[in-house]
């Protein structure tokens, strides 16, 4: 069944009534932008003359940023350092209206930063990412910080409609935190979704999972490239992970959605006029899918809205966001073009 504009508007309007707690690995995304003017004499690499420099929330912070831009009330819970980048991240989130009381400072653990360098020649209208440098600490989290985070979660989880876990495998969403969080959410009847970059089995039993194709393939141990492989593999993964809903993102091929009520379908990607950057697109999809489900959408409806959102943000540079108005406008535009 096609998603109508009226139904989409009903779902999107309900976003503003939802409260979501995002738990996971917080990072700062740093972007340096310039023109590639020549090849260096020191090595066969381009020389970039910088013309722009910006910072954006990354990782779980970007997921929260997206959810806030969609109109929902959102808080973050995770670890940062006791440094300038932590202050910058707090300021960005605070200015967007994201609640940051759950950010725990661990002085011995610098705030994670991911630096991307973008270059475009004088005649180029789009920039290309030419380098990425990750400054990420994956050391085990201290027991003191773990307990402080768990204590915060015990007080916060009952106050929210749902919890969305954003796991970049940087150490925050480790076993002690999961062993406290999942039963806590279950006791209070809270929705739990997870967007994990690996080891999907650690999130067995959650309401919704949103892996990309390589992550799903790694969990299953086989390819999902052919349509029959995708549909069979997705259904198997749904059963193995004992979750109610599974959304597998497929990059330029779109996505596939499965649920325990028999839904199993591939959704083609929306047309995109020039991909600027895929950074954070998975966060947008996870946020929109989760909010749509919390707003009463079916799995297929939630996936269709998430598909629209993903097509919007990949046309923007950096870990971008979208809004309900922008999503609805894109749906109407696509419907008009199809007539």
Where are these regions (language model features)?
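Structural beta-sheet core signal
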Residues: 22, 76-78, 194, 248
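Conserved N-terminal subdomain of the carbohydrate kinase-like
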Residues: 5, 17-20, 28-164, 323-339
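Short coil-to-helix leader/linker segments, especially the first N-terminal amphipathic alpha-helix
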Residues: 1-14, 183
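Flexible glycine/proline-rich, aromatic-decorated loop/lid segments
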Residues: 38-43, 206-214, 253-282, 328-331, ...
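Conserved post-catalytic alpha-helical subdomain immediately downstream of the catalytic base
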Residues: 240-244, 270-333
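Conserved phosphate/ATP/ADP-binding segment of small-molecule kinases
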Residues: 162, 170-264
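Active-site metal-binding loops of divalent metal-dependent hydrolases
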Residues: 26, 168, 284
């Amino acid at each position: 069944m096609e998603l109508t504009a009226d139904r989409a508007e009903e779902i999107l309007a309900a976003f503003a009534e939802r409260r979501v707690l995002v738990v996971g690995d917080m990072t700062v995304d740093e972007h340096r932008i310039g023109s590639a003017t020549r090849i260096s004499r020191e090595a066969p690499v381009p020389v970039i003359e910088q013309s722009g420099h910006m910072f954006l929330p990354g990782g779980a912070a970007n997921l929260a940023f997206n959810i806030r831009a969609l109109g929902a009330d959102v808080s973050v819970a995770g670890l940062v350092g006791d440094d300038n980048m932590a202050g910058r991240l707090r300021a960005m989130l605070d200015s967007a209206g994201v609640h940051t009381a759950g950010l725990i400072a661990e002085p011995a653990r610098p705030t994670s930063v991911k630096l991307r360098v973008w270059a475009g020649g004088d005649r180029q209208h789009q920039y290309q990412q030419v380098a990425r440098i990750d400054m990420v600490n994956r050391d085990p989290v201290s027991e003191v910080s773990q307990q402080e985070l768990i204590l915060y979660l015990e007080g916060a989880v009952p106050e929210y409609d749902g919890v969305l876990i954003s796991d970049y495998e940087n150490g925050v969403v480790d076993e002690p935190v999961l062993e406290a969080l999942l039963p806590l959410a279950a006791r209070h009847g809270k929705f739990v979704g997870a967007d994990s970059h690996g080891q999907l089995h650690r999130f067995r039993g959650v309401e919704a999972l949103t892996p990309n194709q390589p992550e799903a393939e790694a969990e299953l141990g086989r390819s999902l490239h052919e349509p029959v492989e995708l549909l069979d593999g997705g259904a198997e993964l749904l059963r193995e992970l004992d979750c109610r809903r599974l959304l597998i993102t497929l990059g330029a091929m779109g996505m596939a959605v499965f649920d325990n009520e028999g839904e199993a379908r591939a959704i083609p990607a929306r047309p995109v006029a020039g991909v600027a950057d895929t950074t954070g697109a998975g966060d947008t999809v996870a946020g929109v899918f989760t909010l749509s489900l919390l707003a009463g959408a079916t799995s297929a409806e939630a996936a269709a809205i998430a598909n629209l959102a993903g097509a919007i943000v990949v046309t923007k540079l950096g870990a971008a966001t979208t809004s309900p108005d922008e999503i609805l406008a894109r749906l109407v535009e696509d419907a008009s073009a199809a007539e």
